[in-house]
């Protein structure tokens, strides 16, 4: 599937960082051209998230209500509990009230349903998040659709995804794609007229990422690459901006990347590593050797992950602001 933005491409754009420049060829297509052999500049998600948190503190201080986030976690998946604890700590730093509901793995689905319905009725609660994954006997899609769309701070409710398709800005946007957009803006990356490739088409990352990049105001020309794409490597190598969100460790090698391209690694995968005391390490979807080809590269960990949590906080604050105005 290829999404083509209708905006004409032409003219010059400011260079991004010191490693790349923008040139216009005879066909009026913008290209990222390396000035020299490069080592990618780190696209630091931690620093970007810290900057966003400072802005959120100002918004919270001006809000007439205290933002309040509720997280429901079912089961004892260790990684899920780490993620939830990170979110609760972020709430504490910002002054967002948090409610943390822990349920055993054998909990009946109707119990979760009732929690959601009760939370929907709470006027002083602005965000509801169901931590994935859920036990197999639970229907995550159905549970997500029960959440009041105004409180759907994950941005996965069909109402919010539908607003995203319409190009509307009055809904909750999925946290990882919006976090990527925030990172690119923070790094002064101008997407106008650039060829962007999104590797992956999941409903929670790949598809909304493509929509955000093609939307008016971002104005990239977007290609979605997926498992049925005939030559994924060739498509990726054409990208000025490559977003890897496929969930396959180190799939994107340096020969998949155009010299000087901007690469955002959304993947976070646990891979076996006998050299580590714990027996594993975290790896992204992008191989480390891409740092010798790209101009900007987000690390794993420390890239998109912190931004996903920061955007969850931002969605919670936005929900509180909107609900206090009703």
Predicted features and spans:
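Glycine-rich phosphate/diphosphate-binding loop of Rossmann-like nucleotide-binding domains
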Residues: 74, 79-88, 168-258, 262, ...
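Short, well-structured alpha-helical segments in soluble
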Residues: 111-123
